[in-house]
Amino acid sequence: MCDRNGGRRLRQWLIEQIDSSMYPGLIWENDEKTMFRIPWKHAGKQDYNQEVDASIFKAWAVFKGKFKEGDKAEPATWKTRLRCALNKSPDFEEVTDRSQLDISEPYKVYRIVPEEEQKCKLGVAPAGCMSEVPEMECGRSEIEELIKEPSVDEYMGMTKRSPSPPEACRSQILPDWWVQQPSAGLPLVTGYAAYDTHHSAFSQMVISFYYGGKLVGQATTTCLEGCRLSLSQPGLPKLYGPDGLEPVCFPTADTIPSERQRQVTRKLFGHLERGVLLHSNRKGVFVKRLCQGRVFCSGNAVVCKGRPNKLERDEVVQVFDTNQFIRELQQFYATQSRLPDSRVVLCFGEEFPDTVPLRSKLILVQVEQLYARQLVEEAGKSCGAGSLMPALEEPQPDQAFRMFPDICTSHQRPFFRENQQITV
């Protein structure tokens, strides 16, 4: 079924922004209003001003619901989103011989392609479906920019101008677990004799890998120091973390049935080589991101629920609080309220949590403290309900999903049309 609003919505929105004269540098290129200029200054330039030079890209992110005031500013990502939308929409065509990218105020020029011309290029299509472009995909450069962090030059140009998220929504930054051991003193929770310092299940983690919502591998760690989750081989402590960590590798993408999904997953792998470090103890589960690719997470210790939570590089963050989980479990037994969630979910390369179903994500890693998992299973048995925790959804055969929804706005067909439909 065609999306009648995708391409048309971008076209109408952009024309309205040009006519508003609210964005410096966003102007009509000719009197006929068939071409327009859009500012294209690199974030690493010394005179880069985020409020001015990224204003139109920010506006698109706001319009699409990808940014709201108070969120961390990511101008490079905003720019990539709009560029991808423009390049993949049949309504726009870059006029490279008019673009000026090597001047002090660089800009690109785009032409608005008339609908009749689109029909000639694509062939006759049903009315209202002209915004659909067969087999339109995000190019490799767009995918790469969306899944990795901005370059060092871009970052240095943004640090003084990018506001941080509100303090209330920032995860607590903790001392490095793999350099400095945490202090003792977590109060015990009454009523749980097993809840003590020496319970081995505190340090063990059950790690489950999901590609496109399908379980592809699982491991249970045993090392007290934690584990290194990466693509690399062990034996490189200086580059990938302390040598005493248990290596846990991502499963191969070879088993993914869809060729396109395999391609994009492997592309994402290229930015995850250094991986993340995981540590579990009686306080909870902690994570330290080392890889270039962006990693988002959810867990009961994450401050802001229901919005994307990105892990910053080289910061140790608590994502699961065992003490809080035990208190909520006590409440469950006392009042038959909702069973607390024992899971931490790491999402690689895509924003999370968001409105996109878990089954639609390229790479998800579910982490559970073995002790908390055992308590959940016992609670389920005692209530005669089996496991009360919903599993990550498996994709349904006839569902159609797309990679990077709202980014490649003109692509209205699913990439994966095999028996098992997966959005990535």
From Swiss-Prot:
Tissue: Expressed in bone marrow macrophages (at protein level). Mainly expressed in lymphoid tissues. Predominantly expressed in CD8(+)-expressing dendritic cells.
Regulation: induction: By interferon gamma.
GO CC terms: cytoplasm; nucleoplasm; nucleus
Domain of life: Eukaryota
SUPFAM superfamilies for the chain: SMAD/FHA domain, Winged helix' DNA-binding domain
Gene Ontology biological-process annotations: autophagy; cellular response to lipopolysaccharide; cellular response to type II interferon; defense response to bacterium; defense response to protozoan; dendritic cell differentiation; follicular B cell differentiation; germinal center B cell differentiation
Quaternary organization: Interacts with COPS2. Interacts (via C-terminus) with TRIM21 (via C-terminus). Interacts with the BATF-JUNB heterodimer. Interacts with BATF (via bZIP domain); the interaction is direct. Interacts with SPI1.
Protein name (database record): Interferon regulatory factor 8
Gene field: Irf8
